[in-house]
A protein has these predicted regions:
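Short edge beta-strand/loop segments characteristic of extracellular beta-sandwich folds
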Residues: 18, 59-63, 130-138
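Proteolytic processing hotspots in large secreted/extracellular or virion-associated proteins
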Residues: 28-74
């Protein structure tokens, strides 16, 4: 009910929806899916996503912990086709706590794989005056990135939101043409997995 505080408590799940968070009265199509290998059950709060007025507290219990480092766990939204995407969350005493903005399908996943950094047209960097990297992370996405040229901070940005490439426009006052230069790029994903690569250009 939209005008009451709603509680949903099941084994391994706790959801509190404060009064006024739902736009209307809704009858949830709730179900739990269990796979013996999963870190947590998959909880379908509703078969189609229902947006809420604001974020609400969701807690999902872990059934097992295959990875000791608790920062590698995250609450994942689950698509109709079974794909997972990162919502976030924090581990505390066997439970993942997160705030959600819609009633959909959720579970807990783990990400221990660092991002992949690929230089784009590296042989042309010195000539074009542009250093370009493609940074990808399959599970939790790119969270932070930092680049240096010859040990000094270099500003990288994402001028094209479609490609998502990291681009640095070289400043001739700071980067001398013709000499050999070393670029170091560090990329971190949503669970703190980090990749650092060193690349040279002339």
């Amino acid at each position: 009910k939209w005008d009451k505080v709603n509680y949903l408590q099941e084994p391994g799940l706790e959801l509190v929806i404060p009064k006024g968070m739902l736009y209307d009265n809704v009858l949830l199509n709730y179900s739990v899916r269990a796979d013996s290998g999963d870190i947590a059950f998959t909880y379908q709060l509703n078969d189609t996503r229902i947006p809420m007025h604001d974020a609400c507290d969701l807690r999902i219990g872990l059934r097992r912990r295959p990875v000791e480092d608790v920062t590698k766990y995250y609450v994942a939204g689950v698509t109709a086709r079974g794909g997972k995407y990162r919502i976030g969350g924090k581990y505390e005493d066997g439970v993942m706590k997160v705030r959600i903005r819609d009633l959909g399908t959720y579970t807990v996943a783990v990400d221990t794989v660092p991002p992949v950094i690929t230089p784009v047209n590296q042989a042309q960097w010195g000539r074009t005056g542009k250093i370009i990297f493609k940074a990808k992370d399959k599970e939790t996405g790119i969270n932070t990135y930092r680049g240096t040229i010859d040990g000094k901070y270099a500003l990288f940005g994402k001028p094209n939101s479609i490609s998502g490439n990291l681009v640095c426009e070289l400043d001739p006052k700071h980067v001398e043409k013709g000499g050999k230069h070393v670029v170091e790029m560090t990329v971190t994903d949503g669970c703190g997995n980090r990749t650092t690569g060193q690349f040279e250009f002339v």
